[in-house]
């Protein structure tokens, strides 16, 4: 596909808004869920959002493959030849959604040559889109009307954001032992990348299990706001390069 154009972007914003409405309408059924093979929950909202997004994307860009959390069975023997594909989490933060927290989102990235060239994250609860086009600054769109350019705000005294369910992770605890002058805050889902891009927080260390669809759009958005996401060897995250669809431990930095 050629670089993302305004027509496709507009349709993606409308599509994620529609999926978000479905998710919000199913909040009362959030406790009705099953457990997948990887021990993560799956709700009716996950499935409904997945079905809508995939069906619309197949019509919008029929020549681009799609990898969604709910279709992750696609073998690497097929995926490894992809130079470009959509990487989707139709409902990121499912545990937060089940627990009644607003920290859930829809995450869509376009991967080109193992790296995200476009990222879009939508918060259905707040009706806020965060997105970045290739080689462009990251933007925040509130209620489909008000735009704001996102810029990180690095500080020596840091506000560190961590996953709501990861505070007991041994790697995270050990990592924070070596930092000074900081305060921690808990949030769920890929919205943490967006909150750093907005300048609300300054640092997000992740040491627990994390899949590639959990990070791709957020990485793209944070980089477009002036931040970076690197693994523990100071390398940028690479996508669809191994059989496993797992992101390594990383640090998201303003």
Predicted regions mapped to residue ranges:
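DPxDG-like acidic metal-binding loop motif
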Residues: 76-139
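Generic detector of well-ordered alpha-helical packing
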Residues: 47, 70, 90-93, 97, ...
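N-terminal subdomain of lithium-sensitive/metallo-dependent phosphomonoesterases centered on the IMPase/IPPase/PAP
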Residues: 1-91, 174-177, 235
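Short loop->beta-strand "edge-of-pocket" segments that line small-molecule binding or catalytic clefts
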Residues: 149-172, 179-187
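Short helix-loop capping/hinge motifs at secondary-structure junctions, enriched
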Residues: 137-147
């Amino acid at each position: 596909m050629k670089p993302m154009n305004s027509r496709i972007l507009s349709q993606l914003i409308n599509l994620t808004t529609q999926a978000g409405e479905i998710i919000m309408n199913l909040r009362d059924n959030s406790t009705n869920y099953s457990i997948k093979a990887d021990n993560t929950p799956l709700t009716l909202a996950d499935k409904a959002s997945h079905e809508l997004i995939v069906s619309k994307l197949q019509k919008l860009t029929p020549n681009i493959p799609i990898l969604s959390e709910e279709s992750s069975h696609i073998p690497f023997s097929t995926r490894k030849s992809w130079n470009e594909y959509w990487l989707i989490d139709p409902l990121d933060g499912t545990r937060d959604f089940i627990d009644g927290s607003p920290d859930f989102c829809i995450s869509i990235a376009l991967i080109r040559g193992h790296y995200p060239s476009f990222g879009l994250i939508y918060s259905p609860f707040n009706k806020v889109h965060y997105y970045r086009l290739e080689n462009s600054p990251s933007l925040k769109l509130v209620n489909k009307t008000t735009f704001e350019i996102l810029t990180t705000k690095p500080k020596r005294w840091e506000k560190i954001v961590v996953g709501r369910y990861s505070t007991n992770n041994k790697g995270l605890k050990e990592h924070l032992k070596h930092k000074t002058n900081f305060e921690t805050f808990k949030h769920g889902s890929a919205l943490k990348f967006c909150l750093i891009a907005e300048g609300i927080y300054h640092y997000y260390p992740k040491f627990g299990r994390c899949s590639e669809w959990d990070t791709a759009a957020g990485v793209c958005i944070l980089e477009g706001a002036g931040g970076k996401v690197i693994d523990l060897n100071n390398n940028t995250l690479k996508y669809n390069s191994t059989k496993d669809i797992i992101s390594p431990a990383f640090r998201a930095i303003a």
